[in-house]
């Protein structure tokens, strides 16, 4: 059964309960944006890996083909994306 937005949010919220999470995409290709203070002392690659690791089985099986991760602290998110 293909993953949906709620599946992604639920899994990420299990690791980062205080995160602001948004998901775009469908079927087997998604982009997630995760904003949490937990990322404050983590490097960008560490942040992305912490989320991607949650979906290793789905990526390996092909159930999830593409997962793009944008992981920011609240301060980074507040600087504006423009």
Predicted regions mapped to residue ranges:
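N-terminal, polar/charged subdomain of small-to-medium soluble alpha/beta proteins
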Residues: 2-82
């Amino acid at each position: 059964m293909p993953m949906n937005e709620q599946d992604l949010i639920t899994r990420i919220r299990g690791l980062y309960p205080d995160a602001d999470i948004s998901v775009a995409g469908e079927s087997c290709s998604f982009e997630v944006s995760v904003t949490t203070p937990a990322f404050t002392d983590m490097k960008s690659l560490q942040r992305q890996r912490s989320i991607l690791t949650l979906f290793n089985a789905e990526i390996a099986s092909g159930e999830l083909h593409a997962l793009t991760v944008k992981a920011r602290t609240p301060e980074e998110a507040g600087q504006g994306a423009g």
